């Protein structure tokens, strides 16, 4: 969608964490970004000013709560408050990446469930809806008492790999850890490919002695995960696949954080190409073999469908050309 969207009572605002994806979303939706300013005082306090009226409007605030997580989260909370006090009709937040979603349970005694705390804070601030992309744990949706639309990136990845000819029985989709089996199976079903899993002994904290459940010998392997942080999970998994006879290894993740040193780790790993979405804007160096796949069209269409009260279900599937839609 490139023409100006007709309904001017919907407005998009971008905060500072990921302006590039916000600009793409705005262009795809045909809705220009609203005018606002955000600045940080010397003591760290954040000041926001909305530079146009939002009275009676439906507001969508775009912000990834990635590094620096707490600054970006507080900027979002302050913007929500500004919109509420300016008499916006509804305030909706678009989180291409939802920080703290990995803290979704008590893994050890006396640990907090910070994902629930953040959900409470956002809800209490006054939001009406959340649009996000590939939550680390889907149960985080249940931490909110408002609608949460968790969009999936697997259909985007399936379309990309199908165009590259990476599908069928010569390809195997691999989960680099047993917790990602569902994600791997989803991509494998789109590609008509088998799956494999890399598992580790409980005392293998460095993940160096993994073993493969499934057949990868003589096949092209696609590693899939939701968050690429330090790169160690993909790097070690790729080495295991190479030792096990995989001919080529590709990797794909929804969110490319690329924490310090990740580029060095991944560039020495036997990975042909790494695909991530543009959900996170990082200041760290990115490996040379990384390809960015934009999720902006997907998010833009979701925003328009929500505003027009249309179902989002068509966004959760990818139908390869030549397949019967019946």
UniProtKB/Swiss-Prot annotation:
One of its GO terms (biological process) is 5-phosphoribose 1-diphosphate biosynthetic process. Involved in the biosynthesis of the central metabolite phospho-alpha-D-ribosyl-1-pyrophosphate (PRPP) via the transfer of pyrophosphoryl group from ATP to 1-hydroxyl of ribose-5-phosphate (Rib-5-P). It comes from Streptococcus pyogenes serotype M18 (strain MGAS8232). Its EC number is 2.7.6.1. Keywords: ATP-binding, Cytoplasm, Kinase, Magnesium, Metal-binding, Nucleotide biosynthesis, Nucleotide-binding, Transferase. The keyword Glycoprotein does not apply. Pathway: Metabolic intermediate biosynthesis; 5-phospho-alpha-D-ribose 1-diphosphate biosynthesis; 5-phospho-alpha-D-ribose 1-diphosphate from D-ribose 5-phosphate (route I): step 1/1. It catalyses: D-ribose 5-phosphate + ATP = 5-phospho-alpha-D-ribose 1-diphosphate + AMP + H(+). ATP binds at residues 43-45, 102-103. D-ribose 5-phosphate binds at residues 225, 229-233. One of its GO terms (molecular function) is kinase activity. It is found in: Cytoplasm. Its cofactor is Mg(2+). The keyword ATP-binding applies. This is Putative ribose-phosphate pyrophosphokinase 2. The gene is prs2. Mg(2+) binds at residue 136. HAMAP family: RibP_PPkinase_B (MF_00583_B). Coiled coil: none annotated. Pfam families: Pribosyl_synth, Pribosyltran_N. Homohexamer. Belongs to the ribose-phosphate pyrophosphokinase family. Class I subfamily. Binds 1 Mg(2+) ion per subunit. GO terms for cellular component: cytoplasm; ribose phosphate diphosphokinase complex.
């Amino acid at each position: 969608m490139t023409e100006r969207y007709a309904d001017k009572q919907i407005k998009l605002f971008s905060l500072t964490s990921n302006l590039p994806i916000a600009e793409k979303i705005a262009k795809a939706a045909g809705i220009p970004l609203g005018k606002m300013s955000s600045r940080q005082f010397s003591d760290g306090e954040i000041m926001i000013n909305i530079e146009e009226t939002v009275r009676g409007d439906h507001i969508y605030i775009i912000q990834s709560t990635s590094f620096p997580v707490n600054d970006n989260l507080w900027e979002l909370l302050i913007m929500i408050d500004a919109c509420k006090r300016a008499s916006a009709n509804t305030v909706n937040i678009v989180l291409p990446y939802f920080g703290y979603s990995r803290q979704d349970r008590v893994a050890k005694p006396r640990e907090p469930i910070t994902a629930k705390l953040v959900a409470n804070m956002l809800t209490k601030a006054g939001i009406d809806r959340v649009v996000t992309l590939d939550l680390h744990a889907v149960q985080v949706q249940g931490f909110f008492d408002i609608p949460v639309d968790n969009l999936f990136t697997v259909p985007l990845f399936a379309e990309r790999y199908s165009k590259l000819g990476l599908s069928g029985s010569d390809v195997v989709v691999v989960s680099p850890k047993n917790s990602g089996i569902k994600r791997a199976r989803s991509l494998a079903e789109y590609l008509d490919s088998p799956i494999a899993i890399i598992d580790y002994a409980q005392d293998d904290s460095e993940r160096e002695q993994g073993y493969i459940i499934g057949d990868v010998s003589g096949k092209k392997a696609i590693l899939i995960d939701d968050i690429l942080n330090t790169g160690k999970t993909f790097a070690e998994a790729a080495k295991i696949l190479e030792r096990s006879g995989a001919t080529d290894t590709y990797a794909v993740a929804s969110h490319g954080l690329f924490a310090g040193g990740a580029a060095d780790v991944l560039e020495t790993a036997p990975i042909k190409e790494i695909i991530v979405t543009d959900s996170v804007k990082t200041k760290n160096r990115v490996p040379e073999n990384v390809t960015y796949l934009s999720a902006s069209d997907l998010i833009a269409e979701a925003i328009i469908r929500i505003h027009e009260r249309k179902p989002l279900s068509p966004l959760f599937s990818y139908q390869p050309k030549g397949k019967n839609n019946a």
